[in-house]
Design a protein with these regions (language model features):
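FAD-binding core/adjacent interface of flavoenzyme oxidoreductases
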Residues: 1-9, 67-156, 232-240, 251, ...
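Beta1-alpha1 glycine-rich phosphate/pyrophosphate-binding loop at the start
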Residues: 4-68, 72, 144, 153-199
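Predominantly flavin-linked oxidoreductase catalytic cores and closely associated redox partners
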Residues: 104-105, 111-208, 213-222, 289, ...
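FAD-site-proximal beta/loop scaffold in flavoenzymes
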Residues: 114, 136-146, 249-300
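Mid-to-C-terminal Rossmann-like scaffold of FAD/NAD(P)H-dependent oxidoreductases
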Residues: 304, 312, 316-386
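Exposed aromatic-hydrophobic patches
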Residues: 362, 395-406
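Short, aromatic- and glycine-rich surface loops/edge beta-strands on solvent-exposed regions
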Residues: 374, 404-422
Length: 422
């Protein structure tokens, strides 16, 4: 059985950044396992620009951004296996994988970094009534068909869901000559970035209907149209608000689900809100030596933040391997408590003794709040009180905590993060 210091599951933006970071932090024996035929993950089909503004201080396309990390990984002689599917990871960190060349094989790892990314929610999860004709795609599938395979899914398009992929595909389909008739969103707010609404919908005159959903799909062999209806505050269609749209294609951009089947199988504790692992300040799960980063941990808006997070996971995995049995025992653990508008925080716990000099805590809110404050309470004392003109679920928020500040509170058990009205 081959052994590696660090095995990384997934060769997308998170896996690549984690590998590069671990290598730069002194680990020589690293292996990336990727199930696709090339490294880069989802970025390979994201041919639009807007990537890299934070990481490289310039605007890149998805393949260009991935290419920079692939080049770094190859220059650092980081080993990787393509077309390789990981089947199982034991608590002892023995990775079982398979590919055509080697068949079923096992690898022993001192540390494992989970970077499997996420998948799209399908039509089945939505329970939309109607037939099952040809012409219904997830937005990511349509993106791959257009950008990589060179196929046009349809000519008259309706998009359900206003996640970033759906917004970007509204623009992409328009540029390819299709007529995008409407983007419908179940919630009273968009699920995507504000800049994507402006650049992908407003600039192309594509209407966005909030608090609307598809209540019927027409057509047997091929889609012929859909029925759209307004929904009430509980998401139930309002009778009498139905509108008919003729279309041959329905794209679904209705959320992303972190790919955590392997994580659950090995006993990683999961956060029910994010559907990703619970992690501490080192991005380490409840299983010692198993770290998580990127969209498998929680869904990100920008790949730059994925790379930043993955670099932290890679650095901490490297420290774990180098310290081995001499790893210092931690101090007391502080629990982050998201309430009143804050849905979750990553990380969920902080050990000040083990954290870096500064820690970024990322979170999402549960609704749109205008002229509000993002506040953090150390016990009963309000320490952070930051004014925000608007916060929305489609845009990730962050707070920064300094180690020196946390060490001033040796008995602190809970940090409460919440939204307060101005």
């Amino acid at each position: 059985m081959k052994s590696y210091d660090i095995v990384i599951i997934g060769g997308g933006p998170a896996g690549l950044a984690a590998a590069v970071s671990a290598k730069k932090n002194g680990i020589e024996s690293i292996l990336i396992l990727e199930r696709d035929r090339e490294l880069g993950g989802i970025l390979n089909q994201c041919i639009h620009n807007g990537f890299g503004l934070h990481t490289f201080k310039e605007e890149l396309t998805g393949p260009e951004y991935a290419g920079r990390f692939i080049k770094q990984a190859e220059e650092l002689n980081i080993e990787y296996k393509l077309n390789t599917m990981v089947m199982d990871i034991s608590e002892q960190k023995i990775v079982t994988a398979m590919n055509r060349e080697e068949g079923l094989f096992e690898i022993r790892a001192k540390a494992v970094i989970l970077a499997m990314g996420c998948r799209e929610r399908s039509r089945g999860a939505l329970s939309i009534p109607g037939y099952r004709p040809a012409g219904i795609f997830s937005a990511g599938t349509a993106q791959r068909l257009v950008n990589i395979e060179g196929y046009m899914p349809g000519r008259e398009v309706v998009i359900l869901g206003s996640g970033d992929i759906g917004l970007i595909m509204a623009r992409r389909m328009t540029l390819e000559g299709a007529k995008v008739k409407v983007v419908a969103e179940l919630m009273p707010y968009s699920g995507g970035l504000k800049r994507n609404i402006v650049q992908c919908l407003d600039d192309y005159g594509i209407p966005l209907k909030l608090s609307h959903t598809v209540v019927d799909i027409k057509g047997k062999e091929r889609m012929e149209g859909i029925t759209l209806a307004q929904v009430d505050g509980k998401g139930k269609p309002i009778p009498g608000t139905e509108e008919e749209y003729s279309c041959d294609t329905l794209l679904l951009s209705v959320g992303l689900i972190p790919e955590n089947e392997i994580s659950r199988g090995m006993g990683v504790d999961m956060n029910p809100v994010t559907s990703g692992p619970k992690v501490n300040e080192s991005l380490e799960t409840n299983i010692e030596g198993v770290f998580a980063c990127g969209n498998v941990l929680h869904v990100h808006d920008l790949v730059d933040f994925v790379s930043e997070e993955a670099a932290i996971a890679g650095k901490n995995a490297a420290a774990y391997v180098k310290q081995g049995e001499n790893r210092p025992s931690g101090g007391h653990e502080i629990v982050l408590n998201p309430i009143e508008g804050v849905r979750y925080t990553v990380p969920g716990t902080i050990d000040p003794a083990r954290m870096d000099e500064e820690l970024t805590v990322r979170f999402r809110v549960g609704g749109v709040y205008k002229n509000c404050y993002v506040s953090a309470y150390f016990g009963d004392e309000r320490v952070i009180h930051r004014k925000r003109p608007v916060v929305a679920p489609g845009e990730m928020e962050e707070l920064k905590f300094k180690k020196a500040d946390l060490l001033k509170y040796p008995d602190l058990e809970t940090i409460t993060v919440k939204i307060e009205e101005a």
